[in-house]
Amino acid sequence: MTILSAITSISRPNKISKSVISSNGGASLSMGSNSVSCFNACGGGSSYSYSSSYSGSGLDYSYKANYSSSTGYNSSVVIASSTCHCS
């Protein structure tokens, strides 16, 4: 995680690749490590928008969430790659 955070903090917006990780029967996605990486890449404590997409077997999935240090975030659908936009 330290290495990933260091790499993703080099430029903004940040591209973070991650294997598909689903929870709750695939209805939602565990965004823990990506969220931490995005949080660190944005300098910590900042708000950011987090968007992701995944294509496989002819199906396209999209994911978008807004995060703030005070309200947290919600997640849905399975994704494979994502981009952080610091604000």
From Swiss-Prot:
GO terms for biological process: sorocarp development. The lineage of its organism: Eukaryota, Amoebozoa, Evosea, Eumycetozoa, Dictyostelia. It holds the Pfam family Coiled. Belongs to the hssA/B family. The gene is hssl56. It comes from Dictyostelium discoideum. This is HssA/B-like protein 56.
